[in-house]
């Protein structure tokens, strides 16, 4: 049996660009892509914390160090500039791989620089 687990996440990134007429995709600062282990053309889910919208597109590389998070094509309708988003990539693996899997988590500052990285999500407490 294959399980689908979180592979990489950009947490609380901010949308910096939207281009309705660009080919569909999400342009992501190359440094952030690499840190989160997200590959170019990989399917990603985007969760808009600011408005609750959730959608899927694919990642493309934006200039490293630019802080760019650009929603392109139809995805440009899903967020406003400055919206806070969570960008996730998932991977399928068997149960044995899942037992040792650690996701790559990247926590972003307001300017999309790296605030912190981790490979475990803290236990939620009441």
UniProtKB/Swiss-Prot annotation:
**What does the UniProt cofactor note say?**
Binds 1 pyruvoyl group covalently per subunit.
Q: What class of enzyme is it?
A: lyase
Mark the residues carrying the PTM Pyruvic acid (Ser): 25
According to its UniProt record, which cofactors does this protein need? pyruvate
Annotated Gene Ontology cellular components are: cytosol
Cellular localisation: Cytoplasm
EC numbers listed for it are: 4.1.1.11
- Catalytic site positions: 25 (schiff-base intermediate with substrate), 58 (proton donor)
Q: Which domain of life is it from?
A: Bacteria
* Keywords noted in UniProt: Autocatalytic cleavage, Cytoplasm, Decarboxylase, Lyase, Pantothenate biosynthesis, Pyruvate, Schiff base, Zymogen
PTM note says: Is synthesized initially as an inactive proenzyme, which is activated by self-cleavage at a specific serine bond to produce a beta-subunit with a hydroxyl group at its C-terminus and an alpha-subunit with a pyruvoyl group at its N-terminus.
Disulfide bond sites:
none
Pathway in which this enzyme or protein is active: Cofactor biosynthesis; (R)-pantothenate biosynthesis; beta-alanine from L-aspartate: step 1/1
An example GO BP is: pantothenate biosynthetic process
Keyword match Lyase: yes
| Catalytic reaction list | L-aspartate + H(+) = beta-alanine + CO2
Q: Which GO terms describe its molecular function?
A: aspartate 1-decarboxylase activity
Q: What is its main location?
A: cytoplasm
Quaternary context: Heterooctamer of four alpha and four beta subunits.
Q: What does this protein do?
A: Catalyzes the pyruvoyl-dependent decarboxylation of aspartate to produce beta-alanine.
Q: What is the recorded name of this protein?
A: Aspartate 1-decarboxylase
Organism of origin is: Psychrobacter sp. (strain PRwf-1)
Q: Report the gene name.
A: panD
């Amino acid at each position: 049996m294959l399980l689908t687990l979180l592979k990489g996440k950009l947490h609380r990134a901010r949308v910096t660009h939207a281009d309705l007429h660009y080919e569909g995709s999400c342009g992501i600062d190359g440094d952030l892509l690499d840190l989160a282990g997200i590959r170019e053309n990989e399917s990603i889910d985007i969760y808009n914390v600011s408005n609750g919208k959730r959608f899927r597109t694919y990642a493309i590389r934006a200039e490293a160090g630019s802080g760019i998070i650009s929603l392109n094509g139809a995805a440009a309708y899903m967020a406003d500039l400055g919206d806070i988003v969570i960008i996730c990539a998932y991977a399928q693996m068997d149960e044995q791989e899942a037992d040792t899997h650690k996701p790559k988590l990247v926590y972003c500052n307001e300017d999309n620089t790296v605030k912190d990285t981790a490979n475990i999500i803290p236990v939620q407490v009441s």
